[in-house]
């Protein structure tokens, strides 16, 4: 089973290790919230696996390269997400190339995010990151714009396996970034055993956010529309015991999709 992380508000910081297998840190929040920064600085000191994200999804664009580099030096995650631009293949590869040429640190492992308009462009991203020896390759939930975000990653992986798998460059380790509906992971779990074995980790705040808004995950995922709330905008939310109970129920259900 892949390693799972669910981003959490401060009210659940003391239960982080019940929620997540590893810390997933939003880079832009480290300079905005001292409590968040202090908590994750301590977490990253002992984590065997950790991700410091460039916050492109939250901000609309990655935090500046120099800032990302400095955060990597200060917080020392095992993996740093290279700068990307949502749904922009050319700029994502230009940004990744610039960062690796100007800021690459020996011993620091990186995650490269695939962006593009077609499966072919996503596959080209994978090939580039493999050639650059980027350790993990991330597939965002909105992999191809205006596609069915519940099925697009499973469809892509099946296409990639049939058309681009094992072309002599090497095999990737995949990270799945976010989700539209957690039921997607039932589809992911139905992939062939080789593809499932390439999925190293995933992150999503879905069980947490749906829990606090009152949505219960069922056998077919989320039947309500995806909440518009983002974890980064709700760090200080206060949670009732009823909300906490539903969050943990959702987390248990989510893991049943993945296992």
Across the structure, where does each feature detected by a protein language model lie?
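Alpha/beta enzyme core
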Residues: 74, 117-142
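Active-site beta-loop-alpha junctions enriched in small/polar residues
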Residues: 5-11, 30-31, 54-57, 84-87, ...
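Alpha/beta catalytic cores of nucleotide-metabolism and tRNA/nucleoside-modifying enzymes
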Residues: 1-14, 66-72, 81, 90, ...
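Conserved, mostly hydrophobic/aromatic
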Residues: 53, 112, 129, 188
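Short, well-ordered alpha-helical microsegments
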Residues: 12-13, 33-37, 119-123, 153, ...
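Distinct, well-ordered alpha-helical segments
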Residues: 63-64, 91-99, 119-130, 147-160, ...
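Short, well-ordered coil/turn segments that N-cap beta-strands
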Residues: 22, 46-50, 76-78, 106-110, ...
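Non-catalytic, usually N-terminal nucleic-acid engagement modules in DNA/RNA processing proteins
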Residues: 1-104, 193
């Amino acid at each position: 089973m892949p390693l799972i992380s669910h981003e959490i508000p401060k009210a659940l910081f003391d239960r982080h290790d019940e929620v997540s297998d590893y810390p997933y840190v939003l880079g832009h929040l480290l300079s905005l919230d001292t409590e968040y920064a202090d908590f994750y600085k301590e977490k990253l000191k002992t984590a065997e696996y950790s991700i410091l994200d460039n916050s492109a999804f939250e901000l609309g664009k990655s935090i500046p390269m120099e800032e990302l580099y400095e955060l990597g030096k200060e917080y020392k995650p095992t993996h740093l997400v290279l700068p990307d631009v949502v749904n922009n293949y050319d700029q994502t590869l230009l940004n990744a190339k610039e960062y690796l040429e100007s800021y690459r640190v020996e011993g620091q492992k990186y995650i490269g995010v695939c962006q593009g308009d077609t499966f072919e462009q996503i596959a080209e991203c994978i090939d580039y990151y493999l050639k650059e020896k980027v350790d993990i390759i991330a597939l965002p939930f909105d992999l191809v714009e205006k596609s069915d975000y519940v099925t697009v990653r499973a469809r892509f992986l099946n296409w990639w396996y049939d058309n681009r798998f094992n072309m002599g460059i090497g095999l990737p380790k995949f990270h799945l970034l976010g989700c539209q509906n957690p039921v997607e992971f039932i589809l992911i779990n139905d992939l062939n055993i080789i593809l499932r074995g390439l999925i190293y980790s995933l992150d999503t705040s879905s069980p947490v956010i749906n829990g606090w808004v009152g949505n219960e995950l069922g056998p077919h995922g989320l039947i309500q529309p995806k909440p518009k709330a983002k974890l980064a905008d709700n760090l200080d939310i206060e949670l009732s015991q009823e909300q906490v109970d539903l969050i943990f129920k959702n987390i248990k259900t989510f893991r049943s999709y993945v296992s």
